[in-house]
Regions:
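Acidic, low-complexity, intrinsically disordered interaction modules
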Residues: 35-116
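Short, extreme N-terminal segment that most often corresponds to the first beta-strand
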Residues: 1-21, 25-28, 114-125
């Protein structure tokens, strides 16, 4: 995947999570950067980004392979707690809705989501 494709897919994921109130305690790693649903005020160089549904934060450069054991630096890797964790792992009333939707978002790019830990996933060809 190109950097542009990774970024477009990431923004589609963020929009879906924002629309469904699951964009809390979510971290996304792509193109050598760390993006987050949460702002850390002590981090002065954070860049505020926006979608039509809300804000997300570019936390700067990051080597995802130093953060998550099961990562794919060539696409998108995610870590999460909160609402996405509960839905993705089958603990909510709409269990696995996020699993299905994330795979629908990934499919046009020839990718699928694979869970590493209960709190992480990465996209693969």
């Amino acid at each position: 995947m190109t950097a542009t494709q990774n970024h477009k897919m990431m923004e589609k994921i963020i929009c879906f999570l924002q629309k469904t109130d699951m964009f809390t305690m979510v971290n996304i790693y792509t193109n050598g950067h760390h993006y987050s649903s949460d702002n850390y005020p002590e981090k002065e160089d954070t860049i505020v980004c926006k979608t039509k549904y809300g804000e997300y934060y570019d936390m700067g450069e990051c080597d995802v392979e130093k953060i998550v054991e099961y990562a794919n630096k060539d696409t998108i890797t995610m870590t999460f707690e909160g609402p996405l964790y509960y839905d993705y792992n089958g603990y909510s009333e709409h269990s696995h809705h996020s699993y299905d939707k994330l795979n629908q978002i990934a499919e046009p790019y020839g990718l699928y989501a694979e869970q590493g830990y209960a709190w992480s996933l990465a996209f693969y060809k």
